[in-house]
């Protein structure tokens, strides 16, 4: 049986035998957290995307707005693709302690939720290709109350 937001909320309330208002008001948050965990843990192919764009001569590269987790990041120079190695921020800072050091990026790290850090800082404007898992709209956010997880993986919810 596929779940919609309404049927999933009802199933949860029936299972725990509670219609208490504080509990019911928190159901969307519980559901979003469950979806997030499923998406991160399972890394289903249906939620993979790629994005290509140019990065400025800055050590920071913006992540797509629907970004959940990276699979790979590459720099494309004259049609040749070179994959960057994913590391921790501290390693990048040790590798290039002076952000003014420029070159073709070799490494990347998560700077924050919306940004990657590159090392060394790109010497010019390069084309980057990111393969990543994206965050689809939650079953709580879609107009019709349905989602891929609710339709195809209802037992996981």
Positions of predicted regions on the chain:
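Glycine-enriched, solvent-exposed interface loops adjoining structured elements
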Residues: 1-157
């Amino acid at each position: 049986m596929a779940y919609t937001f309404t049927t999933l909320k009802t199933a949860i309330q029936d299972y725990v035998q509670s219609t208490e208002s504080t509990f019911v008001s928190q159901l969307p948050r519980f559901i979003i957290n469950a979806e997030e965990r499923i998406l991160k843990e399972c890394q289903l192919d249906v939620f993979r995307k790629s994005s290509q764009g140019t990065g400025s001569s800055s050590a920071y590269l913006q992540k797509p707005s629907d970004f959940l987790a990276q699979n790979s990041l590459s720099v494309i120079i004259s049609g040749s693709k070179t994959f960057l190695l994913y590391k921790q921020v501290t390693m990048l800072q040790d590798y290039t302690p002076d952000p003014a050091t420029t070159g073709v990026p070799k490494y990347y790290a998560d700077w924050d939720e919306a940004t990657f850090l590159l090392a060394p800082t790109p010497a010019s404007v390069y084309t980057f290709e990111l393969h990543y898992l994206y965050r689809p709209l939650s079953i709580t956010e879609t107009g019709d109350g349905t989602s891929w997880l609710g339709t195809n993986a209802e037992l996981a919810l």
